[in-house]
């Protein structure tokens, strides 16, 4: 199902890429865009996860550098019957997290230092279980490729404003006007595609994550805290790369941008209500939280030296 959705998504974004190419350079531009899109689709499949992690300066951690956090992810992955993903930490004060990778065998999960410092252990476990649910559902392939291609569409459309608007070839009857329109409409269209695949997927990952960690209310509490932090603490890397916003557990954009009018996430209050309903259905089912024995800190390394982590 997710592979079919990914194929449809790639076809749609490739078609949009070609439309932008036609607006910039007529039929020749459209053919060039087709070739570029084909190359991008292949490149995105293999390398988009590394690009996204690089955008946010994520650093990989292990049992030596972040023993408690990595042990928590390992236990959650065991419960989810998943291979152990790579674990990353992003030095960013906004509490947030995402997962990436083309399949469960090549997956990675990333959390910000803000998340590790803001949430308690049960809430962190709920968030990471949510991200592992994305991995289990193969959502990470769709999310990562969407981020890569949607960002390229926006870049190409803006490029057309400066270099394509003057094209007056007979095979492009719309000329500079179409380049201007594409610069405005293409990023919006790409964002609409992101919205179409994101909303139901988040509900599914919330439910799957709650079942993995066994604590729906801990995840609900985490969502409330993350949403408050996302509004209060700007994420400048996300503001510079809005095409990746749909990858995070909560929209990282501050709301000052037009992008936030086209939210890639369902309403947080609705997600919390759904988790509360799930908690009532699960009744007294509360397995022990996924945490390791006390150690020197949940993520290790030096995050500034001024604050201890929730388990340190």
From Swiss-Prot:
Q: Which residues bind Zn(2+)?
A: 130, 134, 202
Q: Does the keyword Lyase apply?
A: no
Could you tell me the EC number(s) of this protein?
3.4.24.-
Name the domain of life this protein comes from: Bacteria
Q: Does the keyword Disulfide bond apply?
A: no
Q: What does the Swiss-Prot or TrEMBL cofactor note state?
A: Binds 1 zinc ion per subunit.
Composition bias of kind Low complexity appears in 287-297
**GO CC terms in record:** plasma membrane
Q: Where are the transmembrane segments?
A: 6-26, 28-48, 145-165, 173-193
Q: Where is the composition biased (Gly residues)?
A: 298-312
Q: What class of enzyme is it?
A: hydrolase
UniProt KW keywords: Cell inner membrane, Cell membrane, Hydrolase, Membrane, Metal-binding, Metalloprotease, Protease, Transmembrane, Transmembrane helix, Zinc
Picking any one GO biological process from the record gives: proteolysis
Chain segments carrying region Disordered: 287-312
Compartments reported by the entry = Cell inner membrane
**What Pfam families does the database record attribute to this sequence?**
Peptidase_M48
Query: Which family does the record claim for this protein?
Result: Belongs to the peptidase M48B family.
Read off the NCBIfam families from this record.
PRK01345.1 (NF002363), PRK03001.1 (NF002826)
What's this protein's name?
Protease HtpX homolog
Originating organism: Azorhizobium caulinodans (strain ATCC 43989 / DSM 5975 / JCM 20966 / LMG 6465 / NBRC 14845 / NCIMB 13405 / ORS 571)
Q: Coding gene?
A: htpX
């Amino acid at each position: 199902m997710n592979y079919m959705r990914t194929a449809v998504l790639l076809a749609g974004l490739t078609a949009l890429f070609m439309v932008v190419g036609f607006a910039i350079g007529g039929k020749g531009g459209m053919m060039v865009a087709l070739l570029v899109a084909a190359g991008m689709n292949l490149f995105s499949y293999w390398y988009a996860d590394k690009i996204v992690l690089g955008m946010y300066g994520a650093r990989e951690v292990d049992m030596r550098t972040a023993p408690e956090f990595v042990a928590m992810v390992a236990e959650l992955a065991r419960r989810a019957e998943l291979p152990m993903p790579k674990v990353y930490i992003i030095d960013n004060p906004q509490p947030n997290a995402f997962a990436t990778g083309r399949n469960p065998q090549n997956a990675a999960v990333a959390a910000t230092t803000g998340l590790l410092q803001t949430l308690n252990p049960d809430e962190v476990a709920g968030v990471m279980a949510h991200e592992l649910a994305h991995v289990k559902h193969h959502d990470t392939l769709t999310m990562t490729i969407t981020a890569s291609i949607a960002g390229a569409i926006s870049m190409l459309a803006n490029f057309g404003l400066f270099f394509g608007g003057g094209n007056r070839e007979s095979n492009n009857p719309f000329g500079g006007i179409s380049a201007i329109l594409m610069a405005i409409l293409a990023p919006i269209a790409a964002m609409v595609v992101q919205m179409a695949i994101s909303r139901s997927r988040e509900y599914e990952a919330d439910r799957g994550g709650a079942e993995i960690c066994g604590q729906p209310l801990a995840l609900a509490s985490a969502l409330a805290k993350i949403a408050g932090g996302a509004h209060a603490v700007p994420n400048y890397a996300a503001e510079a790369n809005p095409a990746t916003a749909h990858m995070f557990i909560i929209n990282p954009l501050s709301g000052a941008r037009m992008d936030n009018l086209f939210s890639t996430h369902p309403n947080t209050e609705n997600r919390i209500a759904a988790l509360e309903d799930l908690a009532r259905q699960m009744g007294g089912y509360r397995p022990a939280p996924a945490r390791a024995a006390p150690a020197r800190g949940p993520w290790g390394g030096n995050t500034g030296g001024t604050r201890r982590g929730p388990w340190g």
